[in-house]
Amino acid sequence: MKKIITRFRAYQLGNAGSSFSYFADNHFTLIEARLTEVNKETLKSELKICCKSQIDCLHITSWDQDHCSVQQLKEILETYLPKRIEFPGYTPHTESGKESLQVIKKYLRSMEKKKKIIAQSITPEYITSLDNATEFGYNNILHHPKFISNNSNDNSTIKHFRKGSFNVLSLGDVESSMISSSLSRQKTTQKETDVMILAH
């Protein structure tokens, strides 16, 4: 197993919601678009420890406000200039979700002439287009959504971060027992999960 400097951080927000980061192989991912007065300084400190001034990837699992706040999303984009944004593949049904999607599109337009930004909607079609995962590899795995459900929580993105010396499985807000059963049968999740971010 190759040595890779790897860090995982869970941030307190001071209110309902979630915020995490995963750093591996000099790549910093912020999980969820949340930035409050409580986690601002800790995020800044974590980036400094990782010798980073910008975020490489902003990974948003759900359009719900506790995962993606419109104003906080704007601040993250303006302050940390992520090179890649991974956002939910289902159509937002709330006003805050719809506005958040427009904020991402506006950011892409504003950065068009400055640098290349990749924005990827994590849809079932996108997941199907990816290569099959191999065991004990160093590539991340997107497990879900493999279909669009009537329950928006079950459309959350499930991602297995496997770029580092330890792995993190992020479950978004998925509630379905069918999805959890399918996930638990995967050899990669059985054998390669060190940290699990539970649905809440």
List each language-model region with its residue ranges.
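Core dinuclear metal-dependent hydrolase active-site scaffold
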Residues: 1-54, 119-198
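Active-site HxH/HxHxD metal-binding segment of metal-dependent hydrolases
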Residues: 57, 65-112
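Short acidic, S/G/P-rich loop/turn micro-motifs used as interaction or catalytic elements
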Residues: 35-38, 64-68, 91-94, 175-178
